[in-house]
């Protein structure tokens, strides 16, 4: 068990202080400079001959990135490079029309324009026009292609001859789009193609951070934006770590940087971007996207959704969820009340979400792992004489993932031992069969979701979140949460095992002592086996007539 202070939950930049001071004056690094994998592959592809005619590049499906790829290709190949954002047969292939006199007007297509060079297209265009692919494939394999006759009802004095082309194709798209290409043609995953990807982030190190600062300076210059000050770079690093959900990685997306820095320029003096201007831009973005999260908090405050942040309850715990809403640009956190009740039975733990077809496969897997750990911890020779049902209360949509398995375990052992759970503490984390607490996703959103509820219901000074220790490097919390941790209003505990988590939420050790949770469960089982089962309702009715 480890209660964290505010420094523990804040990304540390101490080792890069000297580099931060020089960041504004570091030489510019273009987008391509920070994509060595892509650049090396483009270089190889430009020198390839023979049957490999297609290069697949996994990247954001955006014309901006295709322009970057085109510029990278220009440095390796002195050849025609044609980009297309639309695809139809009339534009793709050579075509001709015949006038009333039988004269021909010839128009070259994109493939003809890219002859002896490269054609760059988005994967979506091929997916939207699968019927064109056989002809495209034939053309890039240097087979003869007939030009299209746009006036088939008119006779011409002559017909343009068929032609073979020497064209290489570069297809860009996101991973899911590239995967769908394989359904059109299996050759997309054969020696017919090469593959590379645009890297979306960069690992934090002295050299990489130098390159990253150079990239930011290049973006500011490329899009005529004010340059960042030392403090501005500091705020950008924190925002980048929040975006990647990792203190050891920074984003490389030009679109993300351009939007944030352009917005920050509206809050600046027009000359430089400092800490305050970037902070205001981030606050502005948060405000624009916070309607749904605020409505969720208001539903809790109005009592429409029951979430308790004070007192104690047996068999009830505050879990943490991340909500992904279609059409909403960001995920947000929301606490969920998880409850468990037990009754005499055969040891079965009923997953209500699964039975109601609201629980996904990963959630079901987490439930089974949690049950296996508890059975092992109790060291039972036979099944529990109790059955239990666990449910996400007031949950009306699908629940998936194993990140609630630690909370569900705490809830189950609370009901079995009749030991209350502190409602001031919310829990997130996955559990393995040995009781180790494993990392989960969406930590920042989950913590902030519970924080907002505690803030509006009133801080007690003892509220907080139990989270996996292995998730510490993913923390980049909102400044309000950091401030409350500084002031002792809100707390975060990191744990590595179930034995560390149970004492925080139940104020009792999990095992090893007389008053342990395992001891109480064992005692209850023993009492049950020692005494005769209570009469059922049927037996009592029979006794009335004896």
Please report, for each region that a protein language model flagged, where it lies by residue.
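Conserved ASCE/P-loop NTPase catalytic core
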Residues: 1-182, 187, 194-205, 213-230, ...
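Peripheral, non-AAA+ core regions of ATP-driven protein-machinery
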Residues: 1-27, 40-45, 108-111, 120-130, ...
């Amino acid at each position: 068990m480890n209660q964290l202070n505010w420094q523990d939950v804040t990304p540390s930049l101490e080792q890069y202080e000297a580099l931060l001071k020089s960041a504004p004056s570091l030489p510019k690094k273009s987008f391509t400079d920070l994509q060595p994998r892509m650049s090396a592959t483009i270089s190889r592809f430009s020198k390839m001959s023979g049957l490999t005619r297609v290069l697949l590049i996994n990247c954001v499906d955006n014309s901006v990135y295709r322009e970057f790829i085109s510029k990278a290709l220009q440095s390796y190949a002195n050849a025609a490079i044609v980009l297309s954002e639309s695809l139809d047969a009339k534009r793709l292939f050579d075509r001709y029309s015949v006038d009333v006199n039988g004269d021909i007007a010839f128009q070259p297509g994109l493939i003809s324009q890219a002859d002896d060079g490269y054609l760059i297209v988005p994967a979506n265009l091929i997916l939207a026009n699968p019927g064109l692919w056989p002809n495209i494939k034939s053309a890039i394999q240097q087979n003869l292609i007939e030009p299209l006759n746009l006036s088939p009802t008119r006779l011409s004095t002559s017909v343009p001859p068929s032609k073979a082309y020497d064209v290489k194709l570069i297809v860009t798209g996101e991973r899911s789009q590239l995967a769908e290409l394989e359904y059109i043609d299996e050759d997309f995953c054969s020696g017919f193609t090469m593959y590379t990807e645009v890297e979306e982030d960069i690992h934090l190190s002295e050299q990489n951070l130098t390159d990253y600062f150079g990239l930011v300076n290049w973006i500011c210059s490329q899009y005529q934006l004010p340059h960042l000050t030392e403090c501005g770079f500091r705020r950008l690093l924190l925002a980048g770590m929040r975006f990647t959900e990792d203190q050891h990685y920074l984003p490389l997306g030009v679109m993300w940087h351009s939007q944030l820095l352009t917005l920050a320029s509206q809050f600046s003096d027009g000359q430089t971007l400092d800490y305050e201007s970037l902070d205001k831009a981030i606050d502005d973005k948060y405000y624009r996207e916070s309607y749904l999260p605020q409505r969720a908090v208001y539903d809790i405050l109005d009592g429409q959704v029951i979430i308790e942040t004070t007192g104690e309850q047996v068999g009830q715990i505050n879990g943490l969820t991340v909500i992904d809403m279609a059409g909403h640009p960001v995920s947000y956190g929301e606490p969920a009340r998880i409850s468990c009740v037990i009754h005499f039975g055969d040891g079965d733990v009923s997953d209500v979400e699964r039975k109601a077809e609201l629980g996904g496969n990963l959630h079901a897997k987490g439930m089974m792992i949690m049950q296996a750990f508890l059975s092992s911890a109790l060291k039972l020779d036979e099944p529990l004489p109790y059955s239990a049902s666990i449910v996400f209360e007031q949950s009306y949509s699908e629940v998936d993932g194993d990140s609630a398995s630690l909370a569900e375990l705490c809830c189950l052992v609370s009901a079995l031992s009749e030991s209350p759970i502190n409602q001031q503490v919310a829990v997130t984390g996955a559990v393995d069969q040995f009781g180790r607490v494993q990392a989960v996703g969406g930590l920042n959103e989950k913590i902030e979701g519970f924080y907002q509820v505690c803030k509006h219901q009133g801080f007690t000074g003892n509220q907080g979140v139990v989270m996996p220790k292995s998730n510490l490097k993913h923390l980049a919390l909102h400044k309000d949460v950091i401030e409350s941790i500084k002031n002792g209003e809100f707390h975060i505990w990191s744990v590595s095992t179930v034995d560390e988590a149970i004492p925080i939420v139940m104020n009792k050790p999990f095992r090893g002592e007389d008053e342990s949770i395992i001891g109480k469960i064992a005692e209850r089982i023993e009492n049950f086996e020692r005494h005769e089962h209570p009469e059922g309702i049927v037996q009592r009715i029979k006794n009335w007539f004896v």
